[in-house]
Amino acid sequence: MTNIRKTHPLLKIVNNAFIDLPAPSNISSWWNFGSLLGICLILQILTGLFLAMHYTADTTTAFSSVTHICRDVNYGWIIRYMHANGASMFFICLFMHVGRGLYYGSYTYTETWNIGVILLFATMATAFMGYVLPWGQMSFWGATVITNLLSAIPYIGTNLVEWIWGGFSVDKATLTRFFAFHFIFPFIIAALAMVHLLFLHETGSNNPTGISSDADKIPFHPYYTIKDILGALLLVLALMTLVLFSPDLLGDPDNYTPANPLNTPPHIKPEWYFLFAYAILRSIPNKLGGVLALVLSILILILMPLLHTSKQRSMMFRPISQCLFWILVADLLTLTWIGGQPVEHPYIIIGQLASIMYFLLILVLMPVASTIENNLLKW
């Protein structure tokens, strides 16, 4: 008799996705981040659910309710810090996952890639709204500054911002709606992740060589289930080390001061995972120009399949492109550093150069390098 996992309508789906799925035999640890992102999402939904049981989305009590969670709720402190630092781990995994896609040419699976970009946008929006909820100084001013960027949109800008705020400033209405959206978004992300997986399984996974692996497939279980478990253990180890030894390492001290609309912090900056985009935004002196550059810095990922001029899919055998890729990584690290610095002399010009370099690398240098490599193959 056929095994129930192959016949049962529900188990059949799980079986085809996680057990009998034919996978390439040579995918490296860079392919672990998909499953790690799934684990991060589940962890964030669970810790977030327990936080929501004790949190109040009201300007007068939000800050106090977070303090109450940390001081009075059983293990509230660990739930709160797992949720806050879980977001950091989530973004580390996201950046690695996207970087892997860029390096190995996984963006040629256009449907999977485009849904991935939408997932990235949705996750960034969710993280931003979550950062507003503790209602500290950086929460309030971060919300004010970032939502205000929409006022740069011609004609409808001001109306749009006031519509999002639910008033003439960031206030109770804003906090309440941000909490509502922050709660619902992870479930939308989970649904999109399933669609992401659905499209991936139409084609099967890419592999480091970028060459079809149809001739050499192995079952997902036990090979990649055990590999994913190892990845998960390392992720949890990293997360719990952060949570238990230095939970506030990646946070901003200003967020331990309750929100005060009358007092602006000296340096308004977002969480570390948005600093690269924030640096690009700040490097353009024009408001609308900055906002466009900010959006394009992420949206540019959608153009990747169109910018692919190489005859080879992966960068594994393309040394010039490899070199440019790692320069791009260094450039993003530079932008992240600049985003956290005050707007002063050396930092302004470094930020502007790094921003120009970012777009130049993706739009010009990498496609040109690919064309050069194509011609070198003829020799």
Swiss-Prot record:
Entries under SUPFAM superfamilies matching the protein: a domain/subunit of cytochrome bc1 complex (Ubiquinol-cytochrome c reductase), Transmembrane di-heme cytochromes
Co-factor note (free text): Binds 2 heme b groups non-covalently.
Superkingdom of source: Eukaryota
Keywords noted in UniProt: Electron transport, Heme, Iron, Membrane, Metal-binding, Mitochondrion, Mitochondrion inner membrane, Respiratory chain, Transmembrane, Transmembrane helix, Transport, Ubiquinone
Subcellular location: Mitochondrion inner membrane
GO biological process: mitochondrial electron transport, ubiquinol to cytochrome c
Membrane topology: Multi-pass membrane protein
Ranges annotated as spanning the membrane: 33-53, 77-98, 113-133, 178-198, 226-246, 288-308, 320-340, 347-367
A GO cellular component entry from the record: respiratory chain complex III
UniProt-listed Pfam families: Cytochrom_B_C (PF00032), Cytochrome_B (PF00033)
Cofactors that this protein relies on: heme b
GO molecular function list: metal ion binding; ubiquinol-cytochrome-c reductase activity
UniProt-annotated binding residues for heme b b566: H97, H196
Record-linked PROSITE patterns: CYTB_CTER, CYTB_NTER
Binding site for a ubiquinone: H201
Annotated heme b b562 binding sites: H83, H182
Described function: Component of the ubiquinol-cytochrome c reductase complex (complex III or cytochrome b-c1 complex) that is part of the mitochondrial respiratory chain. The b-c1 complex mediates electron transfer from ubiquinol to cytochrome c. Contributes to the generation of a proton gradient across the mitochondrial membrane that is then used for ATP synthesis.
Record note on quaternary structure: The cytochrome bc1 complex contains 11 subunits: 3 respiratory subunits (MT-CYB, CYC1 and UQCRFS1), 2 core proteins (UQCRC1 and UQCRC2) and 6 low-molecular weight proteins (UQCRH/QCR6, UQCRB/QCR7, UQCRQ/QCR8, UQCR10/QCR9, UQCR11/QCR10 and a cleavage product of UQCRFS1). This cytochrome bc1 complex then forms a dimer.
Family label: Belongs to the cytochrome b family.
Additional notes on this entry: Heme 1 (or BL or b562) is low-potential and absorbs at about 562 nm, and heme 2 (or BH or b566) is high-potential and absorbs at about 566 nm.
Protein name: Cytochrome b
Lineage of origin: Eukaryota, Metazoa, Chordata, Craniata, Vertebrata
